[in-house]
Each structure stands twice: as structure tokens, then as C-alpha cells.
UniProtKB/Swiss-Prot annotation:
InterPro entries: ATP_synth_F1_ATPase_gsu (IPR035968), ATP_synth_F1_gsu (IPR000131)
Annotated GO CC locations: plasma membrane; proton-transporting ATP synthase complex
Keywords noted in UniProt: ATP synthesis, Cell inner membrane, Cell membrane, CF(1), Hydrogen ion transport, Ion transport, Membrane, Transport
Subunit structure: F-type ATPases have 2 components, CF(1) - the catalytic core - and CF(0) - the membrane proton channel. CF(1) has five subunits: alpha(3), beta(3), gamma(1), delta(1), epsilon(1). CF(0) has three main subunits: a, b and c.
tRNA processing is among the record's keywords: no
Membrane topology reported for the UniProt record: Peripheral membrane protein
Protein name: ATP synthase gamma chain
Any one GO biological process: proton motive force-driven plasma membrane ATP synthesis
Biological function: Produces ATP from ADP in the presence of a proton gradient across the membrane. The gamma chain is believed to be important in regulating ATPase activity and the flow of protons through the CF(0) complex.
Subcellular location: Cell inner membrane
């Protein structure tokens, strides 16, 4: 009987876990839908901003004999000072979502250091912060809460310090790493060079001439302002993209956990019925044996 009670207790415990994981799956699914909508709206704004940068950059490129000469576009093929910004979640229970970002960030650190570059790490998200602190890796910046609730103002304040560092020559390159959303079942690691802006990614030779009239002396000022806004929006969009990926990863993890719990309950029920049958058989044998001994 003690064995039956133990199995019954396990069944009850697993069923409670199943209810919890299923509830977490439903919550993540609802949050994912909201984050997807936010990501769609953000992509439209980012595309328009990129178009403006392309148009102004093209105008400056054609106007100058030296081509596009702007601090935000000056590529350094052998950077000696690199800032890596990486985004992880504040919470776990989302499969390999955090570990994949941490793994790629660690690889990038090793790659840059092998080329003689000094790397500064800027972390967003508790899981990444905890990992590197545990491994005694110095973090130049660490923010908790922003990856769970992306905020444009806060993310802009965070990145403005890094941009200032770039303008002052304290860093040669700024790279952003995060786990991005592809669809409800797929996430992928994304690496974006934030600064300097990769001119090869801009369609400078194919964009149409802008109808916007800008004084030549204002071109550089306007481009600087647009690039800064572009950088601010890049980090904000990455936070949204990462959050969507986190929700989809957690939804998958909780779905798998719910299915596993269901299988465990099924196996435990079989085990319980078998043990109960054995207990009944034992009792019958004892009764029959007792009756036989009384004859």
C-alpha cells in the first residue's frame, strides 16, 4: 500500500506540473502575438529610416570627389577596440535560447582577441550577466529588465554612451548579438555591426533621387542625426526581436514539457494499476491461504 500511495503522490505532482507548463505555454503564446505586432510596426519605421540614410549618403557620395566621408561610415578592417553588446533574457525555461547567445558571444570575444583587439562587453539581460560574472569576465555595462520590457527611451540612453565612445575614438567597432525571431518554431543568432555603418549594405547606387531639398552644408549634420536615430532604433528593434524569440522558445519548451508530463502520467498510471493488481492478488492469496489453514 505504501508503494501505491507513493505512485499516486507522483501522479498528482506530475499533473500539477503539467498544468503549470501548459499555462506558461499559453501565456507565452499570447505574449508572442503582441510582440510580433510590435515587431512588424517597428520594421516599417526602420525601413523608412534606412531609405533616408541611403538617400542622404548617396547625395554626399556623388557631391564629393573623395566619396562618402563621414565618421559613421569609416570602416576599420582591423579594429583594435571592439564593443560587443549582447542580449539575453532575464528568465530561463526557454530551451537553448540564452545559451546559444552566450555561446556565440564567447566565440566572438575569442575571435577578436585572437586578432589583438581589446573587447568590451555590454550585457542586456540577467542570464548573460550572471553567466559572465560567474566566469569572472568583466562587463563594461550590465542592464536587467530591458530585455523583458523593451523601452525606447531607456535603450536610447544605453546606446548613446556607446555611440559617444565611438565618436571619441574609444572604440573602433560596435557589434550587436542577439537570438532573433524567425517564426513560432525557429530562432536564429543574429550579429549586426552597428557602427561603423556598413556602406556595402546600403543600396547607394540604386536608390532614387530624393525629393527632399537639403542644403549642402547641412548634409553631414542631417546624416549624423539620422545615423544616431538608426543606431537607437537598431538596439530597440533587436530588443523586440529578442523578446519575440524568447516567447517562442519558451512556448516550445513548455509545450515539450507538457507533452513529457503527459507521457509520465500515462506511465505512472500503468505502474499504479500494475502495483494495485499485484496488491490485490497478494491479498487474495493470503485470504485463500488463511482459509486453507483453517480446514
Amino acid at each position: 500500500m505504501a508503494n501505491l500511495k507513493e505512485i499516486k503522490r507522483k501522479i498528482s505532482s506530475v499533473k500539477n506540473t503539467q498544468k503549470t507548463t501548459n499555462a506558461m505555454k499559453l501565456v507565452s503564446s499570447a505574449k508572442l502575438k503582441r510582440t510580433e505586432e510590435l515587431a512588424k510596426r517597428s520594421r516599417v519605421y526602420a525601413a523608412k529610416l534606412t531609405e533616408l540614410i541611403e538617400e542622404i549618403a548617396q547625395k554626399m557620395q556623388h557631391a564629393s570627389a573623395e566619396g562618402l566621408d563621414n565618421i559613421f561610415f569609416q570602416e576599420n578592417n582591423n579594429p583594435k577596440k571592439v564593443d560587443i553588446i549582447f542580449i539575453t533574457a532575464d528568465k530561463g525555461l526557454c530551451g537553448g535560447f540564452n545559451s546559444q547567445t552566450i555561446k556565440r558571444t564567447s566565440q566572438m570575444i575569442a575571435e577578436y582577441q585572437s586578432k589583438g583587439a581589446k573587447v568590451r562587453l555590454r550585457a542586456i539581460g540577467r542570464k548573460g550577466i550572471d553567466y559572465f560574472k560567474f566566469n569572472n569576465v568583466e562587463l563594461d555595462d550590465a542592464i536587467v529588465g530591458l530585455s523583458a520590457a523593451p523601452d525606447y527611451k531607456q535603450s536610447s540612453e544605453f546606446i548613446s554612451e556607446v555611440v559617444t565612445s565611438y565618436v571619441n575614438g574609444d572604440t573602433d567597432r560596435i557589434v550587436l548579438v542577439h537570438n532573433g525571431y524567425v517564426n513560432m518554431i525557429t530562432q536564429e543568432i543574429r550579429e549586426d555591426q552597428i557602427l561603423p555603418v556598413d556602406a556595402s549594405q546600403l543600396e547607394l547606387s540604386t536608390v532614387s533621387t530624393s525629393e527632399m531639398e537639403v542644403e549642402p552644408d547641412d548634409d553631414d549634420t542631417l546624416l549624423d542625426a539620422l545615423v544616431k536615430r538608426y543606431v537607437e532604433y537598431s538596439i530597440y528593434y533587436a530588443l523586440i526581436d529578442s523578446l519575440a524569440a524568447e516567447h517562442s522558445a519558451r512556448m516550445q519548451a513548455m509545450d515539450a514539457a507538457t507533452k513529457n508530463a503527459k507521457e509520465m502520467v500515462k506511465d505512472l498510471n500503468v505502474k499504479y494499476n500494475k502495483a494495485r493488481q499485484e496488491a490485490i492478488t497478494t491479498e487474495l492469496i493470503e485470504i485463500i491461504s488463511g482459509m486453507e489453514s483453517m480446514k
